[in-house]
């Protein structure tokens, strides 16, 4: 969440940033925060003054008792008792003001970086780079869901039988290709200096709050009511929460972590032609990269993450472009975000396969993730960054469609050492 220091010292900048994100009622929300913070500070001052007065009178009581001036001491005791009652009431008022303030701050998104373009939705996103070659497919080219049926690679109907829509069954060589992609992505991350971790796939409420999924996205998360745990929508959640309530030595930054996980998203309300096949699933596999860094270095880290993801797409030989998201299309927590999309030649559409974001100090403020300066020993909020490197379903869809032949689907050369075959077909054994 945004810091009170930022809101109070740069109020107009914050309001303009929220308006750039098309956050309704930006000025009213910030005015409410400042008003509640004023109440909190005034209540704190009253409480401090009351406690100081009670302490002063308590000292007088001690002195009077030593002088055996019992009546005077008893009279002051009544004043102290009244001050204690007042302090209790003020403590309750202070606790309420602090809770109200936290609640308000949690409803306010991060403000965008100056480089974020103006815009309301995806139509206003800006293409900043393109790469790869769009293949020319024959007129009778099939979409990936038809190819998967033809070569017995994925059974969508069986997934519906077992669980429901959006939970496909991967078969034979396709199951092996899934593992190959995960291994390839993790190995490439390791080569780039990321330490692999294997996190839980369920998290508690504090973890969901720390990374900003709660209370903003609880409707999109699967909730295990009995234990009050949530299935993760991305490995960003457990990996970043490793550093919750942690003070990191400056010399240890940047911290680089990567993790494979299954991801679970309800995607409530999703339907229609854009969700066919692998285009939108409730469960999918993804490799996530996460960085913790200093404010001075975080944008260099962002550029390195963008280069890493782009390198993966080049090795997979997929046509891609990189979008800088406009203010209105950005997530709740991000300060700047880049989407990578690959071209699905049979569907004739672009599919998002990665989002790479710098959240600056917004997430770290919730997480209480700080670093200690080497020279001054003072602590400061870290910057957190994350990105998909990569999400599998749409990558698989593009590989299947773009590399289709009458005999099967050609496997990208970089994956052959990981899966042990160069053609996806129904010869599964």
What residue spans do the PLM features occupy?
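N-terminal alpha-helical targeting/anchoring segments
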Residues: 1-135, 153, 157
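TRNA-recognition modules of translation machinery and tRNA-sensing kinases, especially anticodon-binding
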Residues: 27, 130-429
């Amino acid at each position: 969440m945004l810091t009170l220091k930022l809101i109070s010292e740069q109020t107009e900048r914050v309001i303009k940033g929220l308006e750039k994100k098309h956050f309704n009622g930006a000025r009213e929300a910030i005015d409410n925060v400042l008003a509640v913070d004023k109440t909190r500070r005034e209540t704190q001052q009253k409480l401090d003054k009351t406690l100081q007065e009670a302490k002063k009178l308590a000292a007088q009581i001690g002195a009077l008792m030593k002088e055996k001036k019992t009546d005077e001491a008893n009279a002051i005791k009544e004043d102290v008792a009244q001050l204690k009652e007042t302090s209790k009431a003020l403590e309750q008022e202070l606790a309420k003001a602090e809770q109200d303030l936290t609640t308000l701050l949690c409803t306010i998104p991060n403000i965008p970086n100056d480089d974020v373009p103006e815009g309301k939705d995806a139509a206003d996103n800006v293409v900043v780079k393109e790469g790869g070659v769009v293949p020319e497919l024959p007129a009778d080219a099939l979409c990936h869901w038809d190819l998967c049926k033809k070569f017995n690679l994925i059974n969508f109907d069986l997934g519906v039988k077992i669980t429901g829509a959006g939970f496909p069954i991967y078969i034979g060589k396709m199951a092996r290709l899934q593992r190959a992609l995960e291994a390839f992505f993790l190995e490439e991350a390791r080569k780039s200096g990321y330490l692999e971790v294997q996190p839980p796939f369920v998290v508690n409420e504090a973890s969901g709050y720390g990374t900003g999924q709660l209370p903003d996205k609880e409707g999109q998360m699967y909730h295990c009511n009995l234990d009050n745990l949530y299935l993760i929508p991305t490995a960003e959640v457990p990996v970043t929460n490793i550093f919750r309530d942690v003070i990191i030595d400056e010399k240890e930054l940047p911290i680089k972590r990567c993790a494979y996980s299954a991801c679970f998203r309800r995607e409530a309300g999703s339907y229609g032609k854009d969700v066919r096949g692998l285009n939108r699933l409730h469960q999918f596999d993804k490799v996530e990269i996460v960085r913790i860094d200093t404010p001075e270095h975080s944008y260099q880290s962002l550029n390195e993450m963008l280069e890493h993801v782009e390198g993966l797409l080049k090795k997979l030989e997929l046509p891609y472009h990189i979008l800088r998201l406009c203010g209105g299309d950005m997530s709740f927590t991000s300060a700047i975000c880049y989407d990578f999309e690959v071209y699905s030649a049979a569907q004739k559409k672009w599919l998002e396969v990665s989002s790479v974001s710098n959240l600056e100090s917004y997430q770290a403020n919730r997480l209480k993730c700080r670093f200690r300066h080497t020279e001054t020993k003072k602590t400061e909020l870290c910057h957190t960054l994350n990105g998909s490197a990569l999400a599998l379903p749409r990558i698989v869809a593009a590989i299947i469609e773009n590399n289709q032949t009458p005999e099967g689907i050609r496997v990208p050369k970089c994956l052959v050492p990981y899966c042990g075959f160069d053609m996806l077909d129904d010869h599964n054994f």
